């Protein structure tokens, strides 16, 4: 009698992308555009607010963005695959991440699939990156961010870099997206790596 074949423990090349209603939806769009060229299976969930912000800030329509993902999940579908810990993924990134979404994730009191999927990633000890897009922050926000860091999330505010001497808004977006993907162990050609500056006298 043959022994049962052991289950594979290899994590699928599968990533959850959450887009909330904060300003900066273009970062989420660009990330999907980049990942579409890779072997990574992307699972997208956009909040209703994200769809509104997208139309206001960019020339994209929600259907254009959904076409970039491997799989789409309605924000109200709390029974989706990504709402279960048994659905293995590399992790999740919420980009941009609104203060409301951040707060729901920190408390575990979730109202949509964006925050529910993030909560699942945390409880399963997978990588969760939150690209916060808000300023200024009051003490309550900062305490919530501290809680998120303590429970395992990577708090990565969207902050542009200038050491790479960007020549356009696209350069800034691409570099930021590349750095966010770095946090998930995904290598791209988007980041100009710092190799040290001139020595001081």
What is each residue range found by the language model?
Residues 2-129, 135-201:
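A cross-family phosphate/adenosyl-ligand binding-site feature
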């Amino acid at each position: 009698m043959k022994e049962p074949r052991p289950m594979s423990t290899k994590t699928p090349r599968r990533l959850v992308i959450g887009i909330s209603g904060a300003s900066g939806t273009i970062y989420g769009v660009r990330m999907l555009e980049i990942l579409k060229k890779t072997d990574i299976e992307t699972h997208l969930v956009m909040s209703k607010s994200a769809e509104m912000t997208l139309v206001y800030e960019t020339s994209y329509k929600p259907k254009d963005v959904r076409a970039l993902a491997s799989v789409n999940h309605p924000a109200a579908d709390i029974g989706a695959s990504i709402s279960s810990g048994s659905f293995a993924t590399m992790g999740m990134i919420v980009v941009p991440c609104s203060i409301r979404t951040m707060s729901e994730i920190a408390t575990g009191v979730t109202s949509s699939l964006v925050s529910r999927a993030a909560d699942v990633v945390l409880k399963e000890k997978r990588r969760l990156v939150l690209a916060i897009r808000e300023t200024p922050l009051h003490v309550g926000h900062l305490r919530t961010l501290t809680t998120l860091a303590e429970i395992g999330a990577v708090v990565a505010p969207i902050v542009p870099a200038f050491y790479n001497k960007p020549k356009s808004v696209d350069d800034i977006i691409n570099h930021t997206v590349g750095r966010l993907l770095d946090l998930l162990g995904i290598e791209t050609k988007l980041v100009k790596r710092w190799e040290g500056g001139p020595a001081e006298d």
